[in-house]
């Protein structure tokens, strides 16, 4: 996947349906990305790189596109894929996954099952048993990979405001969150809006 020659919003949309794979010492976990959020760098008041902020904790965000930026928020590990050229702190937060392989162990890792398994940015990383030390490593060069060949394609993509970023002016409501419409593994999904997962993808 091209993380350098396309804008971050385009990448965030294109990641929907991409197969994500993590190999730990015991198990391979896989699933399909169903929810992303784009963060647009120095001008984005909700972004970690807003105004060029650069600390050791966010240093990975300034690396070349295709780098993994892993950070902890409220004890939850969040995984972002860095986009753009080195020095431009833009990226895509992977918010939710439709699980595929390793579901039984995911349920043990999470202490949950069903749609609660992976329907949030800290939930799927716990289900997949992803460690923080992936921060700064390159996607597809270690244990965390994406597969763009054996992927799915959403029937419909919805755009909405990002979650959990109040008081950021216009950036609070900008439609930079992208979801596979109706997929039940999306975070904060109303039951009345849920469809069976197979009906949310193009055949």
Swiss-Prot record:
Any single GO BP term: base-excision repair
Stretches that traverse the bilayer: none
Record-level Gene Ontology MF annotations: alkylbase DNA N-glycosylase activity; DNA binding
Pfam families on file: Pur_DNA_glyco (PF02245)
CDD domains from the UniProt entry: AAG
EC number annotated for this UniProt entry: 3.2.2.-
UniProt keyword annotations, A-Z: DNA damage, DNA repair, Hydrolase
HAMAP family reported for this sequence: 3MGH
Family: Belongs to the DNA glycosylase MPG family.
Protein name: Putative 3-methyladenine DNA glycosylase
Species this protein is from: Staphylococcus saprophyticus subsp. saprophyticus (strain ATCC 15305 / DSM 20229 / NCIMB 8711 / NCTC 7292 / S-41)
Source taxonomy: Bacteria, Bacillati, Bacillota, Bacilli, Bacillales
